[in-house]
Amino acid sequence: MKSWQIDVKYVPQTCILNDFDYDKKFYQYTCIDEATRQRYLYWYEEHTPANTVDFIKRAIKFFNYIPKEIQTDNGTEFTFNRSYIGKVHPMDKLCHQLNIIHHKIRPRTPQHNGKVERSHRNDNERFYTYLSFSTLDELRAKGSAYLLRSNNIPMSVLGYLTPNEMRQKIESYT
C-alpha cells in the first residue's frame, strides 16, 4: 500500500454542454494505490508540471500517507525529454523532497501502467457516458461524488471487497 500509478486522461468533449466553449479542454488526473485499487481523481484545465505537483500534494492528503513509489508514463507533465538535459522536472523535485522513487514506464507501453489505464476505461463507461457539465467547478463536484461511489464498488481482483474495504483490511494488519 505504498505504490501509486498516476496518469492523465482527456475529459471527452461530448460531456460539455452546448453553451460552453468547445475549444476548452479538461483533464482528469488519476492516482491509484496499487495494493488496494483505491483511487483519487482531480480535474484541471491543463496537464502541466505545476498541476502534477499540485495533484500529488492533493493525493497525499487524500490517502493520508506519502507513497514509497510513483509510476507514470513519459508525458511532459511527469518528466522532461532529452532537450531539457540538466533541468530537473518539478515532479522529480517534489519526489526527491519527499523521498519518493519516481518510476517511468518505457515509451509506448501503456500496459505497464495497466491499473490506472483500466480505471480510465471504467471511468468512460461508468461516468463520462452519463456526464454533462458547464464549468470546471461543476465537473469537479460531479467527479467527487463519482469518486466516492467508485471506491465503494466491489472488485473481483480484491476478492469482491471494495477498494476502501481492502485498505481497511491492509491497515488492520500493520
Which residues does each predicted region cover?
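Short small-residue beta-strand/loop micro-motif enriched in glycine and branched aliphatics
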Residues: 37-42, 103-105, 129
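Basic, flexible linker segments flanking DNA-binding modules
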Residues: 1-12, 76, 89-95, 162-171
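Active-site beta-loop-alpha junctions of metal-dependent nucleic acid enzymes
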Residues: 24-25, 41-65, 69
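RNase H-like two-metal-ion nuclease catalytic core shared by retroviral integrases
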Residues: 73-74, 82-85, 89-95, 101-125, ...
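C-terminal domain-tail junction helix/linker
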Residues: 2, 98-100, 122-174
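Mobile-element integrase/transposase regions
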Residues: 1-30, 38, 54, 62
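Buried hydrophobic side chains on well-structured beta-strands
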Residues: 37, 70-73
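Residues immediately flanking
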Residues: 8, 34, 46, 74
